[in-house]
Amino acid sequence: MLANLAHQVVRRRWIVIGTWILLTFAGAFAAGQLSKRWFQSFSIPGFPAYVANQETLKTFGTGEQPPMIAVFTTPGKDVTTVPGIQQAIDAGAAQVHKPVRVGSWFDSHNAMYVSKDRHTMVATIYPPGNATFDTKPPVKEVRAALRKTTPTGVTVHLTGRDPVFESQGEAGGPSVLTEALIGGAGALIILLFVFGTLPAVAMPLLVAVTSILTTFLCVYGLTYLTDVSIVVQFLVALVGLGVAIDYALLVVFRFREELSHGLNTDDALVESMTHAGRSVIVSGSTVAIGLLSMLLIPLPFIRSIGLGGMLIPLISVLASLTLLPAMLSLLGPRINRVRVMPQKFVKPHSPDEGFWGRWSRIVQRRAPLVFVAGAIIVAVVLSPAFHINPSDAELNKQPAKGDAGAGRAAVTAAGMPNGLYLPYVVLVRNGASATTLASVADAVSKTPGVAGATAPPSWRTGSAGLIEAFGTDDANSRTARRTISRLKNDVLPQVETLRNNATTKLGNAAGVKVSLGGIGPENRDFVHAVYGKFPYVLLFVLILTYVLLARAFRSILLPLKAVLLNLVSLGAAYGIVVFVFQDGHGSNAIWGIQATDAVISWIPIMIFAFLFGISMDYEVFMLTRIREEYDETGDTSHAVAHGLARTGKLVTSAALVLMFAFFALSTGPGPDIKQFAIGLAAGIVFDATVIRALLVPATMQLLGKWNWWLPAPVARILRVAPSEG
């Protein structure tokens, strides 16, 4: 089939090239239009906290964004008696688009807004509307109004989640185009050392540019069918760059090798497509399977990344199997002309020469020792993953500068609870009388883990009302999870039942509805929504990948080994992310991010979706060549040695290309993109070194002929020829 495709592409090469040129220009136009069409919010339909927050938003105009926290300090004075502070709060709130919701001591006279020594007071200012990537509360304007109107002798700061993020300068990151150029520059340097000639270097880069822009065109069309997350733009640019170059690298590598064996252009293309093209299809399929699994997660945000991301490998494969052969047929032997690197850097070796040839012989002679060494490295790198904490970081673990940092320090110095940054918000519907609200607030305030709760009189409208509660700990902390669980599963259902029993006796048939909202509970719902389904996602990917590889390599044990080692690579990537970001080893020195005690909740699932398939590429590159050698010789040791020797440089080069692309992605704004990019980069490097250079060849050497075992009954199910064991 692939040989026939090669013939058809060569015969119609100008049509193929012209079609891709048109798609590329259309994609460039579409990329410019996408800024207006990205989906920019997180939503978890059907989950209780999200539903409560959406109902609060519908009724009060607020509820999906955390409050900004105004902090007033009066050393030596009772802050509640200082005139003018309430007017300052009102002036700050006036800078926020209406409807704005404010919680303070002046509205409720509740002690939770005041420190025990009564020298510090906080006020919560809730911005209206949904939270999106572009939503930026008017932090500077509110801060300026507070400073201008706060009485003399009172120190005022504005802190909270959004002021802290604003102090980090997250909006100042490089553009997607800049990141792509950084990644492209790194890829160019690597390709120069791999090929040494300008035409050979240009081929993968042209395929990458075409694939990226065509993917943007497809994503643009997808936005008219469903919501697509803004995160996809980073993935298309950087993951697309790495994947497309990797696939093109494999084909060009094989094409030059076949030319060096004396084949003419057409025959070299047929051989390249038959072998390297097959690897590209299998590799692209494994990446697509990982991303397809995201559709099993019941979150539009994650599903849109899966859908948009799945286009990356599919279009990269298509370009590598059509556009690239068409261009190679025009170049032919001229691909080795216009040398830009000295011959000594790229001089080809026979399979038994060079570093990888020598290394393969070392591995085979000492396979048990190499396997043990690799296993020890895996154990060390993977071990931090066992205490991974998928959650947003607590606010006091976030880097904060200037006034936001000073405000946070003032709250801490006053001994006020960390839970005030992300308050719990309880929504009461269908009968939110003052008595009912007071009863609910009293029950909430007595819950372990809650520092205080109140129902401000201004937080009532019609039959609905709100209660604000400060937890003793940050709502994203591990201890707060128990508090959220108590409130959601015990306290609020009980108080709802009691109030309904009371109203029924009074002849009121309408049932009071009490539900827990706020950013913290919604974050926990997000984690449950994602990781509650993760076992099914994992099983789906493992089964599909195993079947695909079993057909490709005609073996039972090889795909099992590949899947297990890929899981090891994934665990190592998690371990590195935990070690660097959650535990803080190096994150502050490199990115100015202190230990967060958490990995942002959506990062682990997305690392899995991309890394499982991408790292499998290298397994496919190696095993395809090893299987080819084994089919020719019937000698496992010879096949492993020659397979590693012939693909070692290729796998290393491909991994370095992706590593540069992901490091470029790590320069993007926000700790979430950094964690995601470093997780992918670390996983790729670990996979190409420890897994592919140590564990894969050592394991195959130890398994011997069992590598190729495929009983006839299984072969019939897979519809392939059986293989001896």
Could you say what each language-model-derived stretch is?
Residues 22, 30-34, 45, 53, ...:
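N-terminal cofactor/phosphate-binding cores enriched in small/glycine residues
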Residues 1-36, 128-390, 511, 519-725:
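Membrane-embedded transmembrane helical bundles of large multi-pass transporters/channels
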